[in-house]
Amino acid sequence: MGYIDKRRDLLMDFNQLVLTINGFLADKLLVFALVGVGLWFTINLGFIQVRGFGEAWRRTFGGMFKKSGKAGADGMSSFQALATAIAAQVGTGNLAGAATAIAVGGPGAIFWMWVSAFFGMATIYAEALMAQKFKKVGDDGTVTGGPAYYIRAAFPNGFGKVLAVIFSVLITLALGFMGNAVQANSIADAFKTAFNIPPLVVGVVVAAIALFVFVGGIGRIASLTEKIVPIMAAFYIVGSLVVIIANGKYLGTAVASIFIGAFKPEAVLGGGFGYIISRALSKGVARGLFSNEAGMGSTPHAHAVAKVDHPAEQLSLIHI
């Protein structure tokens, strides 16, 4: 029993250490670093998320009705890259992020999520720019790129390589385990609650569908996302509007409570925390249209392989 008790105490101490570190990073350092970086990019890029918004909408809707070329190892079209990036942003995380923000900081936390998202648009613009600029084209025409590539370019010595490796390991863990697990669990819970289908069955079906897509490589991923994402986004927006309209009599009160509560200390904390939760959870086939994973380093991989004559062509879509 002594050995078991010591092992249990050790695990509890380790868990407390993780919670302490996570609390410091999520509640203090990371939140303000992300907003600070976004603010810096916003100022230095001349409020690009405002200046380029009209062009982004024009090119996005134009791309929805324009036939894209076949994606392959040499890359994908601008719209396919955008759809792939959005598919990595829309989903469970947005709902959980907003709910967590409200629970922690009250209605005012939503305002700070808006602020985080606004400045995050400039951060994503910078991420996509660097991904396009520092992407690599192999002798066989294969295109690769992403944060690991521009991290190495920023630090051309051995330190850059070490940072790139660390980033690659961490992003693999975040995207390959945490994000996918949350999405699959949400799907399984929904089917269990609505249709009483065992989670194991749902898990097997989800895994089979994912395998089918992955086996097809970048071509199948791009082809699927460019078809599904517009429909998914439409359902997301229409569903949100239906909820708002159905509760229209409370809209004025809700908006007022958001702005009134926005400048309470607990609201500021809650908004940042909810935003981080939203980014952490939003990985999988579908994620949140209004949560952008700014600074996480996930979406640049999609933008890096866009086949464009000039990086500006892809960057004009980023604000969506």
Which residue stretches match the model-derived regions?
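Juxtamembrane inter-helical linkers in multi-pass membrane proteins
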Residues: A56-S68, K136-A154, I258-F263
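Membrane-interface loop-to-helix entry segments
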Residues: L34-W40, L45-W57, F167, A184-F191, ...
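Juxtamembrane helix-boundary/capping and inter-helix hinge elements in multi-pass membrane proteins
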Residues: A101-A109, K135-G145, P156-G158, A294, ...
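Conserved small/polar residues in nucleotide/adenosyl-binding loops
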Residues: I318-I320
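Helix-loop-helix module between adjacent transmembrane segments
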Residues: F41-T42, S116-G141, R152-N185, D189-V213
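N-terminal alpha-helical transmembrane segments of multi-pass membrane transport
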Residues: L11-T92, A103-A109, G120
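Short, Lys/Arg-enriched N-terminal segments with co-localized hydrophobic residues
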Residues: M1-L11
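Hydrophobic, membrane-embedded alpha-helices of multi-pass small-molecule transporters
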Residues: L29-V37, S77-G93, L163-A184, P198, ...
